[in-house]
Amino acid sequence: MSKAQAVGSNYRVSLGLPVGAVMNSADNSGAKNLYVIAVKGIKGRLNRLPSAGVGDMVMATVKKGKPELRKKVCTGLVVRQRKHWKRKDGVYIYFEDNAGVMCNPKGEVKGNILGPVAKECSDLWPKVATNAGTIV
């Protein structure tokens, strides 16, 4: 995660999207899905795949979508994940799909966000919170 641009408190979220995961695009930027190729801010351990969770910034490529977006490396934010995680109040939460939005390296979203967004992501990235329809 790019700590210089992210604001708010940092949450412990179960990491559900390893490198190589394909997630739906939750915005109207023209991409249909995003293929995770790297996770920002992961130090890691030898032979362990870096994984992303809700609120993490990832480097991704577009596998389906507009031709001008494909075959380029872009940055994205994970806004929903299927893997459950536990919140501080004891509630386990998960979504029905893995989804992310395309953004610039500062965390500013390129399009409008479709569908719900996790509270952990909206607290960390204020530009996501302003564009989100519903925050869960």
From Swiss-Prot:
Record InterPro entries: Ribosomal_uL14 (IPR000218), Ribosomal_uL14_sf (IPR036853)
Biological-process GO terms, alphabetical: translation
Keyword terms: Ribonucleoprotein, Ribosomal protein
Gene Ontology terms: cellular component: cytosolic large ribosomal subunit; extracellular matrix
Gene Ontology terms for molecular function: large ribosomal subunit rRNA binding; structural constituent of ribosome
Family that this chain belongs to: Belongs to the universal ribosomal protein uL14 family.
Protein name: Large ribosomal subunit protein uL14
Organism: Dictyostelium discoideum (Social amoeba)
